[in-house]
Each structure stands twice: as C-alpha cells, then as structure tokens.
Amino acid sequence: EISAPQARPGSSGPGLRVSSSAVRQALAAGDMQGAARLLGRPYAISGHVVHGRKLGRALGASSAEAGDGFRTLNLRFAHWKPAASGIFAVLVHGLSNAPLPGVANLGVRPSLNPHDVNGGRVLLETHCLTWPADLGPEGAYGKIVRVELLHKLHDELKYDGLDALTAGIAKDCADARAYFASAHALTLTSLHTETRRQTTRDRI
C-alpha cells in the first residue's frame, strides 16, 4: 500500500489548494523543489518494506557472503506509470528517531530481468547511506516507512552487467552525499523534518 501527498485543484501554497496537473508536471520534469513548493512539503511515498531479490546487499559487498553491500528497502508502487521516475536523493522516515539520508531508484530497473521476483512492476528501491545497526540485515522488512524524494540525480540507466551497475550505484551514493552536504538541501529538508503518517492515497 503506497500513500503520498494528494494535490488539490486550486491555488498554491502550504495548506492551500493546488493544481494536481502542475504537481504532475513538476514531478515528470524532475523538479522536486517545484513539487515541494506546490505541496507544501517534499513529495513522498509511503509503504511496507517488502522482500526482493536481495541483490543490492551483494553488490559492492566486502566479501562474497558478507551481505554488507547496497542494502535496499523495497516498496511496491501502486501505479504502473508514476509521475516521477529516476534516481533521487531521499530522506527515509520510520527506521530511526531521525530521518536517514539515502539514494533511491523509482522505476522498472532496466538493468535487471523484468521477469524476476517483482514481475516487472514499478518499485521504489532505497539505499540508506547510513544503516541503523540495531536493525540488523533483516530488521526493516514489514516496517512502514516514508521516503521523501528531495532531488533528482538522473533518469534510470541501463548498465551492461553487474560490475557497471555496482559502479553506477556507488556514484549515485557519492552524488547524494554531495547533495546533502550542500546548503541547497536545507531548503527541502526544513519543509518536513518530523515523521508523520500519511493517510491520503497517491493520485499523482
């Protein structure tokens, strides 16, 4: 079950009615700041963390059996064609007392087999740049998290093999860290810093 801010037709501004088409256009263009201004908070996706192939934890791991690579949170998306897609710098709420910075892929994972365990469905796959030690490798499954999409890094890319995919994810992590280290990130993170359960179904 995925939930996210629902735009209401009308005027713009926090707490006021906004154009849902304007929000969709901003998301499609990768203008996450524009979408956040219209919604009054960063665009977010919420849901239960589900099991996937567990491929991420093997990519970039310190050893073959370590499982300490790019551990990811998988959320199935309700729509086949979400307004936003690509790779994003994100904040994850619900795993610890403070939101966790991360990098996320929202889309169909073109580098992997579309007939895998997820059946080619749209997924939000999020790698937290820091992982809470008390969760352990399996502790996030079943938890409800909210992932705020703050900044689009680039569109989805198709990599030639797992080595290229691993290098691409590593670069995305570095770019996300650079984003969070910049003053630019403060504008969006200040909009919404407290965990709040969303009850509005995503219509965007």
Go through each PLM region and give its residues.
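Proline- and acidic/polar-enriched loop/turn elements at helix boundaries
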Residues: 4, 48-50
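Contiguous mid-protein beta-loop-alpha structural module that forms a pocket-lining wall or clamp
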Residues: 1-40
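Phosphate/ribose-recognition catalytic cores of enzymes acting on nucleotide-derived substrates
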Residues: 50-204
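Acidic/polar loop patches that form or flank catalytic/metal-binding clefts of enzymes
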Residues: 36, 46, 99-101
